[in-house]
Amino acid sequence: MLMSIVLFAIGLVLLIKGGDWFVDGATGIAKRFNLPDIVVGATVVSIGTTLPEVMVSTTGALQGSGAMAYGNAIGSIICNTALIAAISIVCNPGPVNTKSMKTPAIFFFASAGLYCLASYVLGTFPRWMGFVMLSIFVVYMVLTVRNGMKNPDEAEHEEEEEGKQRTLLMELALLVVGAAVIAVGADLLVEHGQIIAIGLGVPETVVALLFVALGTSLPELVTTITSLRSGHASLGVGNVIGANVFNLVLVSGVAVSLAPFDVPCENFLLDTGLNMSLVFEIPVMLGVMSLMIFPTLASKKLARWQGLLLLGIYIAFCVCQFVL
């Protein structure tokens, strides 16, 4: 199993590095067409940083591991919110522009409702639901770009990189190589994640919820740290909410459209026979998002107690995966 752990770690590194190359190449190409920064940021960069999750979930679904696809989406949302956003809130609480949070919050809970329909009522994620998720994603992207064009001051402005001097051929190479590296990393992650799960005697869902989710959430962690250093903690939190929408409608949408899967039934709450995904994991996902969003919208500020409570929930969530 040691070799599988090493290859799993290599897969994570390839995912992250491949994502960086893909974003650099795609951003460079997009800017050659003089697209506004907000359009580039809301489309190319956002999709590029979510590509690792897309590839992992899609690879898992195509290989018959619905648990990996399912767990990665939910786990990434919990990790983004209760760990990454929580760190940002604890380090830099204060007033926040709630107007920019409303649209992604509405889309998140609407998409979560669709997710709950599949999980609690249907017991499966049919292909038509994948198409609906992708349709929601398109609408969300259009509204995000329109809002950014109307309110350019609220948009995130990326610093110009030295890479601007790259040739078109180099940018195309970064795009293609980045996508290929992500694909290889995703394959390693899924294959050896399954082996590690068997070796540890835990369901694949646990590996996806904790280790895979944390690894694929590292780009959001980097964004949050950058926002903290520049004194824009609320920007980091906004990026997290947007990333969570992507996890529900883009990551799950692509995976379900290509390879529909059933809700995993391999992990049960103690000896009750209750599916952990339904009675624990989805409620935690909805709970941490509610804890981050609703008090903030009501008070128009991020409070340190929110961050501390979210961190406590994340630690408890991780422990419970091995105890319950």
Which residues fall in each region the model found?
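Hydrophobic alpha-helical segments, chiefly the membrane-spanning helices
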Residues: 1-324
